[in-house]
């Protein structure tokens, strides 16, 4: 064997090793982009299927958060339920007024606010029952009414239905066999229960850590 042949043969293993490393590099070079593309596709699918927190909060906004939080704490009501009622009652329009005479954010009837004040459930000295276009006052009376209903009824569905149709009517429906939702005879109340329940779940999903107090 010549010295040249020996040297040539001696180099072959190294050459093969370099070629193997090169093939490994190019293999990873081709695979990594595919992995990245797959990861991006999965992320996009997740984002498309599950709205981001920002998108959800656009669908379920909050205004007058400090007033809601304060009244909810004072009366022991979930502030997110208050927000859901406001969204469905007035869509956050503090100047809203119905043909029936319901006023403001939570569409409180003047006779309801007067009765709540008479019962001592709201401090009428601090919150004038006739000033229902004022957001702070309206939220206080609307939240106090939710608290009153919660103390006299046994489920959130009952409370929501009673906020729309009145507690007496809900008690009539409850006296019948079957589920409340099946016994509701007012189409408006049936739809109201569906909408507020959906909004309530939407607010809970959008604010998992509770109401964000921002003005």
Question: Would you name each region that the model predicts?
Answer:
Residues 30-49:
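Hydrophobic membrane-insertion alpha-helices, especially the h-region
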Residues 1-28:
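N-terminal Lys/Arg-rich, disordered targeting/topogenic segments
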Residues 21-34, 103-106:
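Extended, non-globular alpha-helical segments
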Residues 47-215:
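Catalytic glycan-binding domains that act on GlcNAc-containing polysaccharides
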Residues 7, 19-21, 35, 98-101, ...:
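Generic detector of intrinsically disordered, low-complexity, polar/charged segments
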